[in-house]
Amino acid sequence: MAEQPIRYEFIKECKQTGARLGRVHTPHGSFETPVFMPVGTLATVKTMSPDELKSMDAGIILSNTYHLWLRPGHDIVKEAGGLHKFMNWDRAILTDSGGFQVFSLSKFRNIEEEGVHFRNHLNGDKLFLSPEKAMEIQNALGSDIMMAFDECPPYPAEYDYMKRSVERTSRWAERCLEAHGRSDEQGLFGIVQGGEYEDLRTQSAKDLVSLDFPGYAIGGLSVGEPKHVMNRVLEFTTPLLPKDKPRYLMGVGSPDALIDGAIRGVDMFDCVLPTRIARNGTVFTNEGRLNMKNAKYERDFRPIDEECSCHTCKNYSRAYIRHLIRCNETFGIRLTTYHNLHFLLHLMEQVRQAIREDRLGDFREEFFERYGYNKPNAKSF
């Protein structure tokens, strides 16, 4: 049998927490896990160049099937030689299936066994996305890791609805495997659903593991549920997944959730949070978040975070960044975006080092204390 395009290499387990250190091998290089993946929705991580992403050690980025299908069209990306060539990125790329966007962006949708009828959120045109179509688009994009097309139920959802949804997602996963045309070049991950119901998560994981995907995602979290619910779901879901395959928690990117997810056995994370809040002038620091529009930074000539080694912090002051953000200058957004992405990528580097040293529990305690998560009514990002 030919070697799988995606392979997980286990390195070690943290004796203090059970978190795992590993490495994922792809056709476009390998990366250590736990890892955070910057999101490049439209084949670009907003305001960042590929070289800038490399300078902060991003080993894999995420791109969005739904958005690239609408603009510029997967046929154009294929003609360009695939997503890697199109955007000049020679490291790993993961594409989502488009399912989440269909369920979150379209106000009008009709779910049937065959797929989902919905309206284009840009112009109202009628569209149809099925497991087969999602595979066709992702095969054309040529990402290293593709995602199965799943149903994304709202939170909270009634048990009976969720049960039907999980069963449909399992049937769709099987159809995705059958329709996947480049299984020797692209790895396809299944997505475990089931909301907060343990028996449904168990059923979903069992169904998908029996299909032997090269990796598994945990979907349906970070959709509005409290953080303790997410942690509880992870506690009973990750042990259901194979130890020799990567585990990916979709749509999660706040520092606390990254650390807590790693402690519960997750290997891969993605989220638009660092880039989205950067565009509003909000930045991560080791002492918590700062809003750079705040008047108190008008004459503050220190870097955003004096412990940070990123390009922004080595070269520019809070006062300068505040000025740029308040004047809606693109360069200000570039500086805050670079810093936030670097902050999360560096945080994951610290998490990996703490796993090596069997002290991730201690690291969590120190980080949470400084960041402000232990304060009463602390915000979760």
From Swiss-Prot:
Residues 251-257, 275-279 are annotated as: RNA binding. It is an enzyme of class 2 (transferase). Keywords: Glycosyltransferase, Metal-binding, Queuosine biosynthesis, Transferase, tRNA processing, Zinc. Pathway: tRNA modification; tRNA-queuosine biosynthesis. Its EC number is 2.4.2.29. Gene3D superfamilies: Queuine tRNA-ribosyltransferase-like. Substrate binds at residues 96-100, 150, 193, 220. Pfam families: TGT. SUPFAM superfamilies: tRNA-guanine transglycosylase. Binds 1 zinc ion per subunit. One of its GO terms (biological process) is queuosine biosynthetic process. PANTHER family: QUEUINE TRNA-RIBOSYLTRANSFERASE (PTHR46499:SF1). NCBIfam families: Q_tRNA_tgt, tgt_general. Homodimer. Within each dimer, one monomer is responsible for RNA recognition and catalysis, while the other monomer binds to the replacement base PreQ1. Belongs to the queuine tRNA-ribosyltransferase family. Catalyzes the base-exchange of a guanine (G) residue with the queuine precursor 7-aminomethyl-7-deazaguanine (PreQ1) at position 34 (anticodon wobble position) in tRNAs with GU(N) anticodons (tRNA-Asp, -Asn, -His and -Tyr). Catalysis occurs through a double-displacement mechanism. The nucleophile active site attacks the C1' of nucleotide 34 to detach the guanine base from the RNA, forming a covalent enzyme-RNA intermediate. The proton acceptor active site deprotonates the incoming PreQ1, allowing a nucleophilic attack on the C1' of the ribose to form the product. This is Queuine tRNA-ribosyltransferase.
